[in-house]
């Protein structure tokens, strides 16, 4: 079986970036496959044959290059396995030619991975995760056999939808994957990589109404009054849910990344990671009660004890913590006699529901939650006075 090694060639000019390339060996014949991945010598780990991803200003770029490199290696492995399965001889040149033909012809796998890498480079980690999840599902459907963008048609999408439903996916789940694939397809159309074939016209791409996830104020009050002092994991989960509710339904990823410096002069200021919108919240006593409950770590820049220190796998750690919290919230729901399947996302819905119950205009509640889609939330003008939203929030918290 052929082998592939990652190599780095430093620049002959001091201070210039070097180039990463792949060394392919088959039957003792060596071929080189060039890439356009350029890094500095001190960004390459010679022993591990990988890029050193740090917290510098080039961190996102290096992470993107490392993941593109890992994807290339996966593609090369798939190509080699497919050639092996043919039970016919092949050369190192055949491997290189197959790799380059998919790249030049813009295969779906390769094109999507390029989008994922760019999303991560831009810091849009959650969106990149959604695209990665879709790519993984589509690759499983295809049995790791790549397909050109020009070969995407209605029949293929209908087969993929049937495959998803056969695996037990509900319509909203299959629609989630289809909408992402449609976005990928449209991006390829913009780049004029193929002609429009309307491949999604016979598959479902809508959103079915789901069970409401809002929790009434009376239930939140029961949750707040639970004595969980002997169950610290449940207490932490409850506190994170309440903090989200107190801060107008702040998303958990925004909570996790709050910095101590974001709280100043009685106001909490942060930028939504999903939309980039800047929000300012008046600091209330209930918020302080939660923050004050947990010992301050002088070495950590974060306001809440979700993330400890900035590190490479911050997002992975955040996801693990959120998973544990959501799991514990199910037990809290049982203890507080709450029938809704409780999760951190419920806090966001619950604040909006409470605002509606107080006859607070939707324009005010949508501003409070940081929505930016006029079609879904009728967002107020960006110049809306923050005091209006703070007053609405204080009105809700008084009932707890």
Feature map (PLM): residue ranges:
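Basic/aromatic-enriched alpha-helical hairpins
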Residues: 25-29, 81-167
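N-terminal DNA-binding recognition helix of tyrosine site-specific recombinases/integrases
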Residues: 134-141, 147-151, 155-158, 166-199, ...
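Flexible interdomain linker/hinge and immediately adjacent N-terminus
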Residues: 158-160, 194-225, 309-317
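Active-site/catalytic core of tyrosine-dependent DNA strand-transfer enzymes
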Residues: 220, 284-339
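Short, basic (Lys/Arg/His-rich) helix/loop patches that form interaction surfaces
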Residues: 229-232, 297, 326-367
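Short, polar N-cap/turn motifs at the start of nucleic acid-interacting alpha helices
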Residues: 261-269, 338-340, 360-379
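Catalytic-site neighborhood detector that most strongly recognizes the C-terminal catalytic loop/helix
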Residues: 272-276, 369-394
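DNA/chromatin major-groove-contacting recognition/catalytic segments
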Residues: 280-285, 289, 293-294, 382-400
């Amino acid at each position: 079986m052929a082998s592939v090694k990652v190599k780095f060639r430093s620049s002959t000019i001091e201070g210039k970036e070097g180039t990463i390339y792949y060394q392919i060996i088959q039957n003792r014949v060596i071929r080189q496959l060039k890439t356009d991945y350029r890094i500095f010598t001190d960004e390459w780990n010679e022993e591990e044959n990988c890029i050193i991803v740090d917290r510098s200003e080039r961190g996102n770029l290096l992470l993107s290059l490392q993941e593109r490199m890992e994807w290339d290696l996966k593609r090369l492995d798939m190509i080699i396995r497919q050639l092996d399965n043919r039970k016919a001889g092949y050369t190192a040149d055949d491997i290189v030619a197959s790799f380059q033909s998919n790249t030049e012809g813009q295969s779906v796998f390769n094109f999507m991975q390029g989008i994922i890498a760019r999303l991560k480079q831009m810091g849009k980690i959650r969106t990149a995760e959604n695209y990665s999840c879709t790519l993984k599902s589509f690759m499983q459907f295809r049995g790791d056999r790549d397909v050109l963008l020009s070969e995407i048609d209605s029949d293929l999408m209908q087969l993929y939808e049937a495959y998803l439903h056969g695996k037990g996916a509900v319509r909203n789940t299959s629609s989630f994957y289809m909408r992402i694939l449609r976005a990928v397809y449209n991006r390829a159309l913009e780049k004029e990589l193929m002609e429009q074939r309307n491949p999604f016209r016979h598959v479902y791409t809508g959103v079915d109404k789901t069970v409401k996830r809002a929790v009434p104020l009376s239930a939140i009050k029961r949750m707040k009054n639970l004595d969980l002092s002997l169950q610290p994991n449940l207490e932490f989960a409850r506190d994170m849910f309440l903090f989200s509710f107190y801060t107008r339904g702040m998303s958990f990823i925004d909570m996790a990344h709050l910095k101590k410096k974001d709280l100043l002069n009685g106001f909490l200021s942060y930028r939504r990671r999903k939309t980039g919108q800047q929000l300012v919240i008046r600091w209330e006593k209930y918020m302080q009660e939660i923050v004050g409950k947990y010992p301050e770590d002088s070495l950590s820049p974060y306001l809440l004890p979700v993330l400890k220190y900035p590190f490479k796998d911050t997002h992975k750690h955040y996801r693990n913590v959120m998973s544990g919290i959501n799991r514990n919230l199910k037990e809290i729901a049982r203890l507080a006699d709450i029938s809704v399947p409780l999760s951190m996302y419920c806090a966001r819905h619950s604040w909006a529901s409470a605002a509606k119950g107080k006859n607070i205009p939707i324009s005010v509640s949508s501003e409070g939650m940081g929505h930016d889609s006029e079609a879904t939330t009728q967002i107020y003008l960006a110049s809306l006075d923050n005091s209006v939203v703070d007053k609405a929030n204080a009105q809700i918290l008084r009932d707890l």
